[in-house]
Amino acid sequence: MVLADLGKRINSAVNNAISNTQDDFTTSVDVMLKGIVTALLESDVNIALVSKLRNNIRSQLLSENRSEKSTTNAQTKKLIQKTVFDELCKLVTCEGSEEKAFVPKKRKTNIIMFVGLQGSGKTTSCTKLAVYYSKRGFKVGLVCADTFRAGAFDQLKQNAIRARIPFYGSYTETDPAKVAEEGINKFKKEKFDIIIVDTSGRHHQEEELFQEMIEISNVIKPNQTIMVLDASIGQAAEQQSKAFKESSDFGAIILTKMDGHARGGGAISAVAATNTPIIFIGTGEHIHDLEKFSPKSFISKLLGIGDIESLFEQLQTVSNKEDAKATMENIQKGKFTLLDFKKQMQTIMKMGPLSNIAQMIPGMSNMMNQVGEEETSQKMKKMVYVLDSMTKEELESDGRMFIEEPTRMVRVAKGSGTSVFEVEMILMQQQMMARMAQTATQQQPGAPGANARMPGMPNMPGMPNMPGMPNMPGMPKVTPQMMQQAQQKLKQNPGLMQNMMNMFGGGMGGGMGGGMPDMNEMMKMMQDPQMQQMAKQFGMG
């Protein structure tokens, strides 16, 4: 996502200010604001909106700093982060959007009409929204009322078939209002919950287009009218949305092509200024690449803080409820099997492009930028191959039998076309996830250590009690080169694999040869700078 560059620049400006607050606070704030303002203007955010944001941040920070004469560095850091975060959220927030939000109801006919210019991604967005609601238990139908563009019905038909969504259209009828009415009557008789109507678009805002939209709207009486806007037009989105608003009085907006343009931030802020809520953003070409828009979630992902709420929502839509229940029961018993690990990997791979998932996980977006999506995807597939080569008994275990019987690793490596070292690394990752899952369970309200936090992990703005993740101020960063060097050290010291797994898994007992682990060798390895950095990342340094 090109918007990630904007996030990096804002983060850089904030982090520089945080590290220099011990000098002159006012100067540090002004330097930070210069960096933020430049980044926003280059992303095509309206200059008046940027000026307002700058003034708000500056006045709040200087006022708070004067009133709190004995603030610590940690308090100053939190103040800067929270103020910048809150003001960026305001920049993309439509006032009263929550009160205006349309919520479709099951067992009732909900008609949604789409409008917009040709080429904005309107027809594709219709299918994406149909898939979104279908996943949530609604019975959804698509109607093509675009009789102007050649191939419009074919496009919607192909998309609908691929997404397994019922559709209606006509190759002969030229009256769009009549086609829309016929389609709605058909789906009403069949008790559909949601009927989505796609309308014609034009290359320009022609009077005929607006008149056609009014005629269709008068006939079908939609519960919600959605305008689809191309995010690549930047702040010009404001003028376009106002022109449509005067004619069709739409109630919400979907912004498309947010994955490929730096001007998306400008489009969002411009639309928010028109006081029309953005309900979804398109983040790719796949039919699942539609995200519910929330100002806090958007800014969190932009700044690399992550969006755990959206991640959980996506996990729920693709995960098997019985599998999830079984995994949770295992975790509560203090057990996380290789089969649980495999199911988690398969669920993640169903969620669409890894770059979209990485934005929701704190610190992961930067890692994806360093390693690359294709390489990461290939590694995940290889992990599944390794797990597929294990027996039922092995998958239902917690991995100890591989340590007790190393020949099992050799067999799995041969069966999956990988190396013994790669099998070892997957076992180590499973142990790390087991420890994290058990820790999360222990820290639920009422459990011992419920308020415990990992050492060195700061809270992030707008996300109370949410521990920060890698790449934040004060945290060391593990680079791909460091990981490769650490892996080389493990290859050169194969006996240390047991020790690493003991360290991550809470002590699994029994060595490769049945003896005590060689702690002297372990200590030597952990004194290496690369390994120390890795240890700190996992809260062990």
UniProtKB/Swiss-Prot annotation:
EC number in record = 3.6.5.4
**Any one GO molecular-function label of the UniProt entry:** GTPase activity
Q: Which CDD domains match?
A: SRP54_G
Cellular location(s): Cytoplasm; Endoplasmic reticulum
Q: Where do the record's region annotations for M-domain lie?
A: 304-541
GO BP terms = SRP-dependent cotranslational protein targeting to membrane; SRP-dependent cotranslational protein targeting to membrane, signal sequence recognition; SRP-dependent cotranslational protein targeting to membrane, translocation
Q: Does the keyword Zinc apply?
A: no
Chain residues that bind GTP: 116-123, 198-202, 256-259
Q: Which GO terms describe its cellular component?
A: cytosol; endoplasmic reticulum; signal recognition particle, endoplasmic reticulum targeting
Key words of the record: Cytoplasm, Endoplasmic reticulum, GTP-binding, GTPase activation, Hydrolase, Nucleotide-binding, Ribonucleoprotein, RNA-binding, Signal recognition particle
Under which main EC class is this enzyme filed? hydrolase
Q: Pfam families, alphabetically?
A: SRP54 (PF00448), SRP54_N (PF02881), SRP_SPB (PF02978)
What chemistry does it catalyse, as a reaction equation?
GTP + H2O = GDP + phosphate + H(+)
- On the tree of life, the source organism's domain of life is Eukaryota
Which region ranges are annotated with the description G-domain? 1-303
Family stated for the protein in its record: Belongs to the GTP-binding SRP family. SRP54 subfamily.
In the UniProt entry, what is the domain comment? The NG domain, also named G domain, is a special guanosine triphosphatase (GTPase) domain, which binds GTP and forms a guanosine 5'-triphosphate (GTP)-dependent complex with a homologous NG domain in the SRP receptor subunit SRP101. The two NG domains undergo cooperative rearrangements upon their assembly, which culminate in the reciprocal activation of the GTPase activity of one another. SRP receptor compaction upon binding with cargo-loaded SRP and GTPase rearrangement drive SRP-mediated cotranslational protein translocation into the ER.
Q: Which PANTHER family match?
A: SIGNAL RECOGNITION PARTICLE 54K PROTEIN SRP54, SIGNAL RECOGNITION PARTICLE SUBUNIT SRP54
Q: Tell me, how does this one assemble?
A: Fungal signal recognition particle (SRP) complex consists of a 7S RNA molecule (scR1) and at least six protein subunits: SRP72, SRP68, SRP54, SEC65, SRP21 and SRP14. Interacts with SRP101.
Q: What role does this protein play?
A: Signal-recognition-particle (SRP) assembly has a crucial role in targeting secretory proteins to the rough endoplasmic reticulum (ER) membrane. SRP is required for the cotranslational protein translocation for ER import and preferentially recognizes strongly hydrophobic signal sequences. It is involved in targeting the nascent chain-ribosome (RNC) complex to the ER and is proposed to participate in the arrest of nascent chain elongation during membrane targeting. SRP54 binds to the signal sequence of presecretory protein when they emerge from the ribosomes.
This chain belongs to the protein called Signal recognition particle subunit SRP54
